[in-house]
């Protein structure tokens, strides 16, 4: 029911052809809006977390050449970026339509503004964690920056089977060398009919996922591009990206046992939900996108 409702409430796509037809009618208008936004330090927009029209800070520090990343920018007063506010909007909507049921949500994230916002949602019981180190056992209590949290390995968590109505992670999967093992683990801990929701670098121009680096059984890493790609990480400072995902990621989800894997795209300029603002439309631009799949 939640999955069917999510498809009805948001624009979702099973493959590049239907997305391409939909996006071609919106691409130029979206880019014009983003060009206007990047000329300002802040804009006014509606935030689902703040439940009000609020100032959204345009720049976060992340840039493409001199263009600010609007995926990591457009930050609301509670600290949620455009990417995080998209996630919050979808989870909030699912909580509203859950008919009063308390939803168990496993979130592979902690100590962030998004985690705090999700934990305040009525009808959602959040179980949050961080990845600490390979030698740490999943389920172990750890201290990060003076705060207690729990270590969980997304490929081998300590959660029991069918523990969650929703499993969620945000820009985690690209950092997992064996990401298919993570998808299998996500499936294991979901209840039947439960939803997997996640963000990741998903490039709608790519039919296939691009592998940037690989890791052998001994843990040795081979870089497959001239300049390895690292992303900021709150625990380790920076972390290697192994993949730039394409539409084949949806096939991986179906192969793992999920049904109805789709890309959810939510353009809403008034709410600060835009593309990442990368000027290279054929290689680096990403729409405001999440992946959704059902067990």
What are these regions, as identified by a protein language model?
Residues 85, 177, 244:
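Conserved phosphate-coordination/catalytic loops
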Residues 3-4:
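Extended, low-complexity, charged intrinsically disordered regions
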Residues 90-95, 152-155, 183-184, 276-279:
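A generic local structural motif
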Residues 17-102:
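N-terminal juxtadomain amphipathic helix
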Residues 7-25, 31-45, 180-294:
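S-adenosyl-L-methionine-dependent methyltransferase catalytic module, highlighting the catalytic core
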Residues 67-73, 141-153, 241-243, 281-289:
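Glycine-rich, flexible loop segments associated with nucleotide phosphate handling
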Residues 100-217, 247-253, 289-294:
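Conserved SAM-binding loop
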Residues 58-59, 97-102, 171, 186, ...:
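Short, charged, low-hydrophobicity "junction" segments
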């Amino acid at each position: 029911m939640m999955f069917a409702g999510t498809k009805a409430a948001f624009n979702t796509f099973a493959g590049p052809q239907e997305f391409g037809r939909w996006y071609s009618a919106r691409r130029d208008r979206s880019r014009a809006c983003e060009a206007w936004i990047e000329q300002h330090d802040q804009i006014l927009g509606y935030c689902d977390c703040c439940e009000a029209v609020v100032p959204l800070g345009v720049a976060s520090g992340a840039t493409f050449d001199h263009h600010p990343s609007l995926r990591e920018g457009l930050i609301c007063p509670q600290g949620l970026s455009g990417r995080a506010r998209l996630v919050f909007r979808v989870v909030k909507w699912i909580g509203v339509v859950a008919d009063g049921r308390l939803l168990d949500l496993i979130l592979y994230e902690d100590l962030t503004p998004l985690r705090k916002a999700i934990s305040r949602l009525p009808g959602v019981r959040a179980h949050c964690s961080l990845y600490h180190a390979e030698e740490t056992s999943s389920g172990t209590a750890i201290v990060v920056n003076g705060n207690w949290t729990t270590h969980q390995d997304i490929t081998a968590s300590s959660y029991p089977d069918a523990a969650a109505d929703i499993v969620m992670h945000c820009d985690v999967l690209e950092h997992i060398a064996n990401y298919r093992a993570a998808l299998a683990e996500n499936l294991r801990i979901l209840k039947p009919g439960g939803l997997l929701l996640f963000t990741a670098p998903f490039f709608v121009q790519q039919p296939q996922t691009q592998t940037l680096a690989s890791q052998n059984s001994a843990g040795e890493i081979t870089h497959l591009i001239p300049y390895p790609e690292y992303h900021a990480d709150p625990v380790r400072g920076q972390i290697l990206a192994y993949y730039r995902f394409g539409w084949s990621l949806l096939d991986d989800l179906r192969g793992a046992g999920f049904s109805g894997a789709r890309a959810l795209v939510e353009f809403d300029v008034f709410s600060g939900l835009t593309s990442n603002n990368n000027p290279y439309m054929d290689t680096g631009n990403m729409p405001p996108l999440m992946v959704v799949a059902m067990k």
